[in-house]
Amino acid sequence: MLIPDIWAETCDFDPEQREFDIEPYYTGPLLDAHFHMPAAFAPPPVVAHELPYEIAVFDDHISKDGLICLLDKQNIKSVIGFYPVLDNLPLDSIKDMKYFEEKHPDRVNAFLLPISISQWMKDEWPVLPGQDLEQYLEMLPFTKGYGEFAFYLEVYERQDEHLEADDPEMIETYEILEKRNMIFMSHPGNRDMPALLKMIEKYPNIIFLFHGEEIKKPQLSQILEKYTNVYYSLDYNMISNCCLHNNPQTDSKETFLPKYRDTFEQTMKDELRIWKPIIEKHPDKIMWGTDILKPWHIDEEVQPLLIEMSRSFIGGLDPAVQEKYAYKNAERMLGMVKTTQLPVDTTIPAWIYFHTWVNNLIQLLISNVIIGAAAIVAAIVGIVFAVRRRSGGTKRPKPARQDLEDYEEQYLQRQGQRPRRRHAKSRPTSSSCNSCGKPLKPTVKFCGSCGTRID
C-alpha cells in the first residue's frame, strides 16, 4: 500500500518490539472483523446512562488519521467498522463515514448501527423504521452491513419484554438488507438463537455474522456446518482469560496490563486448546477481530500487546488455515475477492483418500514392472548382439577363391533349382568332321552339319 508523503511526517511505521518470544508467530496481514469506530461525539447523558461502558470518541481519544496510523503500524489491511448513528444527531456521524470512504478507501468497511432516540423516547424499541433506514443508506451507498446489533443491551429490554430477532421491527430491517445485499452483524444471547435461526433460514441471501461467547461452542459448530450464510468472528474479549470488557478487576489500562502480561503465555495454550479444533474444522467460516471499543483499548501500549496476542494465537493454527482466519475469510465475506472455495464444509471423506492411495500404488507398481521388463529385454538383446559380434556374426561370407560357376551351382541348389550344365574343359579336337569333312571349331562335341559326335 502506498502511503502519502504526509504520513511519513505524522505516523511512525517502525515495527513494535515483541514482549513475548512465542513461536510460531504469524507476521502476515490482518483484517479486523470487529472494530467499534469511535463516536463522532460523546453520547448525550440519556444514552450514556444506558451504556455499560465508556466509548471512544474521535478527537477526544484519537484522531481519524491517527486511527489509520494505528492500523498501519500493525499491518492491519482494513477493519469492519461499526458506526453508531443517533437519528436525532446523525450529521456528524455521516461526515465521519464519508471522510474515511473518501480519504482512506478500502480501510474501513462501513457497518451502520442507527439508534432511534425518537422511538426510544416514545417507549418503543429504538430500531430505526425501515423508511428512515432507506434514507440513510441512500446517503451512504458504500455501507456494507448493519450492526453490531447487540440484543443483550438494556435498550432492547423493558419490564418482562425483550426485542426478539423475528419481531416486526427486525423483519423490516432484514427485508432492506436482503434487497441491498448487506450483512447483518449481531451479538446474540442464548435466548435469541431460536428466533435468529428462523431468520437465517428465512433469508438465505443475507449473510449473518455473529460474535459473542454466549453461543455455546457445540451449537456454534453445528450452525456453521449447517448454514452457508453464517460466519463468526473470534475476538479479544474471548481470547483472554482476563477479558477486555466489563471486568472490574481489569477495566482500565493500569489494572489490565499487569494481569494480561502475567497470563499471556498460559492464555495462549488454553485458548488454542479450546478454539484450534473449532477453527480448523470450519476453516472458511471463522475470522479474527478485536472488539476494540473503550478509550484505553486504543492506547499505544495496550493495542500492540493485543495484536501480539492475536499473532501468537494465529501462529499456533494449522499453516493452511492461518491466512484464512487472519483476513481472507473476512475479505471473501465482504465480497472483496473472488474465490473458488465455497463457504461450506468441503472435507473430502477418508475413504476417497484411501481409494486414491490404492490406485496410485497400483499404477506405481505397474509402471515399475513395465520399466523393469523393458530393461531386462534390452539387456538380453544387448548380450546377444555382443556375442554375435565377437564370434563373427551370422553373415555368410562369399568364398574368396571358389570358382564363380561352383558358387553359382551351390546357390542354385540352395534355391531348389537344377544347376546349369557345366562347360567342359577346353580340349583340342580335329579341325574338320570325319564324316562330311566340314570344318569344326576346336572345342565342339558334335558336327553342326551331319550331327556326327566328335570324340
Pin down the residues of each PLM region.
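Mid-to-C-terminal alpha-helical segments outside catalytic/metal-binding sites
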Residues: 3-33, 38-42, 47-78, 281-285, ...
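Acidic-and-aromatic substrate-binding clefts and catalytic sites of carbohydrate-active enzymes
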Residues: 42, 56-62, 83-93, 117-129, ...
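Selective detector of the "anchor" transmembrane alpha-helix that sits immediately C-terminal
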Residues: 366-386
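Acidic/histidine-rich helix-loop elements
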Residues: 35-62, 121, 156-162, 242-245, ...
